[in-house]
Amino acid sequence: MGRFIVNSTLVLVVLTTFTFFAMGQDWLPQTPSFLLKLLPKPKFEKHTLEGSEENGRVIDLQGGWLNEGKLTEMVIRSKDMEKGWDVPERIKIRNGRIRGSIRIYGLGVNGEAAKVRESSHREGHTARAQVAAPRAILLEDLQIEANHRIPLYLSPGVTGVTVKNCTFTGWSASTTVYLDAESGGNRIEGCTFEVRSGREVMAVDGSATNTIIGNRFFQARYGGIYLYRNCGEGGTVRHQAPQGNVIENNFFNMKDLRSGSYGIWLGSRQGRRSYCEDDAGYPFGSSIDNRDFADHNILRGNIFQPASDHAVRDDGSDNRILQK
């Protein structure tokens, strides 16, 4: 047992040392997500806005730091009440800096949360998730410095979020932006993505009718924007497919794109995950078909430099791809 403890401690020390050295040497972007997730997770303080009592709240940081620059998770969440979900809306956070992450959620923090999974086993899940989740949130003119966690996570059912003129830096063990199942109608505009990510920059996972326009993807070694449906993970049935999204006038730096990665990939998974059958037994959604159905999306005016045959991969159907 003593030897095990010593060995475990040594591993943690090595990983911690590797983290700081890798950041200094700009190695993290070349490190895949599964390795980055082994690194020690830093401790975050929480700043929480919960329920309708926060409706219309404006947090103007006036160019300064949220929480004095301490590593912080800003949480905007609904409150589970006896009579239903008490939902916050029309919150604005703007004009400042955040060291950490922002997560917005209702039914659950991610697609595998217990209440999300329970709801997904019945028809009408998308509507329930959206009714329960925060809506009409504005994040504007923010500088978000990531540290290990995904810096912006819109959880199942979140709708009507606008992310405008924000800059994302730092590093993430996963993606930079995650649009989770059953979310939709969100807008990401005029943002700059320079996070050293262990995966694609932006995951559109069963999220629909979003607009992603006029953004700059400067760190896209493992891909830029991927549309898919994360079939079966955690036993949750995914109902909505990543359809009706508009991806327009974005710039992608393709210089360091890794083999097998793409600037934009419509249908990046298609059931190629070991857990895809974990939601079996229900007559709808990903339970009956593990494919992504990344269909009916519009891509236009996007710029990929240098030019590459890995700019766009279309594994969906009826997508309109109009490039400059």
Regions found by a protein language model. Give the residues of each.
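Extracellular parallel beta-helix/beta-solenoid repeat domains
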Residues: 23-324
